[in-house]
Amino acid sequence: MDYATHYDVGDRKRDGGINEDSVAVSVFEQGHRAGFRGYDRDGAAGANEAESNDAEDPDDGADEGDAPEAEPPVDGESDRGESEADEAPPDGDPANRSAAVFALADGAGGHDAGDAASYIATTAVCEHLAGTVVTAARGDPAGFDLAVDEPLATPPRDADLESAVAEAVVAAHREVLEYAADAGEQAHATVVAGVVVGGRCHFGWVGDSRAYVVNAAREEILPLTTDHAVVQRLREAGEVDDVAALVHPRSNEITRAVGGSGRADPETATVDVETATVPLYREDVLLVTSDGLVDAQTEASKLYEWYVDAGRDEEMAAVVRDRAVTDDEIRDEVLSAASLSDAAGRLVDLANDRGGKDNLSTLLLHDGTLPPTPEDPPARAAGTRTAVEERETRVQ
């Protein structure tokens, strides 16, 4: 598994602001015997997962080709050498099996300690989930052509891992509240966090930071999250269309966050964490980002007024799309990049080119050992997929 991160204060805040975003990722890698043979080798690991999950879907993505040699990290950029492992290894070459925990948080700048909130959130989430991801990977030895029963635990199901993510975010929420109470400050942050293991991503979120899948085989971008935000509520109510949402003047208002003023009891306080699970494929790049990527336009309010005054006509809609950052542009930047680190940097540059209104951060992950994208993949975008508790049991 390869990953890259990039984070930036944003052009508008460069001379006087601070970066209140925080990104954390922890990758567990294991090599054994002749190397990891993948999740689709004779159906081995997939069948193991189906059996242990009451026969839930054992879902099986174009290689980027020869990526250029990785450059040293600079200015808030990290790059874990995707030049070698970004492709699925040829038959016979040893490969490591990978799993990961990730968390991205965006501190609320309108409050006293957003930077502390985001730091606490990302570190707390990863601390709580580190053991979970190793346990999940350890319980599935079939990818190494190995059959072990006792003493290995049965691999956790999708619902178990989603619950673990939610519990980690709630734990982070309580830690931020404890900090706020001790410091006498308000501390809020949005969070996107998850576990990538067994060819699946189990994730949860609070607020308007986002997760996407960009798939090279189908040349598409799939939003995995829906914003917990005022503008999203207006969209769902039919009061705001997709173009207006790009530049809406209330784009900075969220309806859910971790942390608070410290008045809530840190021992019992909770937050509603939305969770989901999706399969990942060889051609996928998992992208996690703060809202600074998509809410970058410093003249958003003016563009919104022009669009509304023009009767929301298509000509003005095209102007808005051209000046805002759209999902299609994000897809194109990722697919045309030479490497994950190149993509991460290009996304930050894109947001700054459009105004750089806020702090922005990106995390991209790719696993070349995964199965290729099937011809008819399951629905993965937010609003189209089936909740884990509603999936029908399948016999493979």
Q: Which residues does each PLM region occupy?
A:
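PP2C/PPM-type serine/threonine phosphatase catalytic domain
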Residues: 1-396
